[in-house]
Amino acid sequence: MSDYKSTLNLPETGFPMRGDLAKREPGMLARWTDDDLYGIIRAAKKGKKTFILHDGPPYANGSIHIGHSVNKILKDIIVKSKGLAGYDSPYVPGWDCHGLPIELKVEQEFGKPGEKFTAAEFRAKCREYAATQVDGQRKDFIRLGVLGDWSHPYLTMDFNTEANIIRALGKIIGNGHLHKGAKPVHWCVDCRSALAEAEVEYYDKTSPSIDVAFNAVDAAAVAAKFGAQNVNGPVSLVIWTTTPWTLPANRAISLHAEIDYVLVQIEGQALIVAKDLLESVMKRINVADYTVLGETKGAQLELMRFTHPFMGFDVPAILGEHVTLDAGTGAVHTAGGHGPDDYTISQKYGLEIANPVGPDGTYLPGTYPGLDGVNVFKANDQIVELLREKGALLNVAKLLHSYPCCWRHKTPIIFRATPQWFVSMDQKGLRAQSLKEIKGVQWIPDWGQARIESMVANRPDWCISRQRTWGVPMSLFVHKETQELHPRTLELMEEVAKRVEQDGIQAWWDLDPRDIMGDDADVYEKVPDTLDVWFDSGSTHSSVVDVRPEFAGHAADMYLEGSDQHRGWFMSSLMISTAMKGKAPYRQVLTHGFTVDGQGRKMSKSIGNTVSPQDVMNKLGADILRLWVASTDYTGEMAVSDEILKRAADAYRRIRNTARFLLANLNGFDPAKDMVKPEEMVVLDRWAVGCAKAAQDDIVKAYEAYDFHEVVQRLMRFCSIEMGSFYLDIIKDRQYTAKADSVARRSCQTALYHISEALVRWIAPILSFTADEVWGYLPGEREKYVFTGEWYDGLFGLADTEAMNDAYWDALLKVRGEVNKVIEQARADKKVGGSLEAAVTLYAEPELAAKLTALGEELRFVLLTSQAKVEDYASAAADAQQSELLKGLKVALAKAEGEKCPRCWHYTTDIGKVAEHAEICGRCVSNVAGDGEKRKFA
């Protein structure tokens, strides 16, 4: 028996079946670095329209976690897809390098500044520490396959950037947005510093919940407001609070003008509470027997005076919109030094903003006998006892509630009025302009707009000063007596900025004011404060984007961060850009959700459910991590676990297998010589190229909409269904058995070539390593890297006017699916071994029958059977099976006639007709020794 194996065109490629990504990716990365791939891309894209995704700087502290990976991978997918869409999209990664977490790390290792070394040495150690952290994180980000200018990232501690941050503040001052005030700010007693809004987290805490009576100075006058005369005992306004420690700073009681208040007689005294809260208050203070003596609106009680229970002075009743009926008594204890609402209303009434608490959270000397030097949280019990002694305590209980805590220390924080510098939201219309700018930005997902609008609408003035060592100095000089800014502030700030540009922020602390202001130094002093780190990162649109040459003066198109950044980086950037330039710093803002485990729980080291990106890359490879990110809907929480990553690895295998099949069957194909013109191609091959065109249209549209899980779904549908279970199955016979350079085979290879050229580009933004690998195995002349090109423009499809158009092949797909069901059943019943052992008869209604007979002899190749014929539906044999999907179709199956051809494995009755090739069928004889078979349709 002759061996005909050598006459077959068997698939062959060096592209490995197994990805072995964890082993192979580092080698590819080394090549990318050696070749300066990022530089090659920039050169290739020079002069194209720009798309700038500005990197929100991660904090230079600790190893990267899964959330960092999600963020950087999403950015990389966008930058690479924009490149393929014809944009020049430079990506400059950045790091946030100043601030408290770095100070704390350096303190832990070396001690506090001033203890063992100077503040200047401390700053040098902070700079050193931040630099090592940047290097560690950079390695991991590069390992993810993220392309960017990693050799020249921006750091907020670069001397240039530090100088430009000072200039940004100068511009804001010049535009009239800065003011000084003793406003209550979030204050961490452990950090001994003000905290930004974004540095506050909420945890459950048990606090004392107390009801306190403030006695009216003129009981009769207050009772008269209720139309009451025969009052027994003192008249008291009742407040409810969970922060007894703030009572020494009380300077008023707030009521709501429109709320109804009642005067209630209980044993020995009369109480004033909100009418709607009367029952709950009486229940709380354990009073069953009471009489309502009268009622009045809050407005009637304005400026009536009440005696502070223990401070020895009296306070007014004032009116505020912040008073609600949600809880308490309807009367709010008001301490302007300890709360933003209290501060605002106290300002309105011109009340003293008292702050008896020091930076360490203890009462200042002279606060009250026995309280001086006591920690405020420890003082709660003392104050409760004091109120009890004074007869002012109506009730005390414990309340578990959500309480603001420091993001670093996880300890409760306080509101504390300290002299600070603020960016005013309203004195020059910053709030109104910011709200206007928000409307011109595209927010993705769109609920981001309402979220940031409500935050901007309700936020207080932004406290930008900090009492820290490692930060950009405010670089201000104030009059020693009046504390007014120097009249030449902007010039002086520019002078400081120039020095910082040369020597970094230490230049400020080394500066002798005489050097830049002469004799004015006698009456002006340096402001010792540093800037909030959110000012550092929030001004990068100016300190980085406006000055980096690769951005060529273009503003950022997109900011992309986690959804917590509405109140963080998106907010600070919007405030600074609007205050400086009157406009938003971005055109689009995309937010992604947080990572959770497979059960939807927050990642936590204590639960042990964290997924380390380093582990995933070392075990499965970065492309699997990238595929997981792309296939997860980032608009909500993003679940990740070993099981979920295993599913991503399975999907990856399907894509890799498709790519390998394509490459293996392009063996021996030279696109310069072997390409078949579209009009001469087999119809099914043109259909397959059309499928790729439709898929590409969908995929490109999904990339443009940043809908990456849709990209992955469409890619999987193309690989698994349109190609895997239909086209690639059908063409194996023609591909392997036809004459090597026949039109039948070259037509098929032409289709596979076009599909491969398109597919490698579709996967490049997501599966970057795999795309690079595939690219290296594709035939034909090409650029060195897929990343320098654009979407493939060589695809074409079938015209709708053709008889065998897309709709025709869709119908054939369905028929084939129905035939497969019958064959599978026959295999299960042991009637046939494989589909080529089958002969099928399709009983079809006239319209469908016409479609099937149009294929003539080639119908069997589409059905993957050795024989196939079409008969009238009405003449169906009794054993024909009715299709569930297609009403006008019945399928009958029999064993194929004849013998199995050892070369093509089809069953046929013409084996042995040609003496020289007596073992093979007539079709194979033609393909081996004759002109080769002709295929028109499939």
UniProtKB/Swiss-Prot annotation:
One Pfam family cited in the UniProt record for this chain: Anticodon_1
Cellular compartment(s): Cytoplasm
Record: residues binding ATP: K605
Cofactor or coenzyme needed: Zn(2+)
Similarity annotation: Belongs to the class-I aminoacyl-tRNA synthetase family. IleS type 1 subfamily.
Assembly mode: Monomer.
Name of this protein: Isoleucine--tRNA ligase
Lineage, broadest ranks: Bacteria, Pseudomonadati, Pseudomonadota, Gammaproteobacteria, Enterobacterales
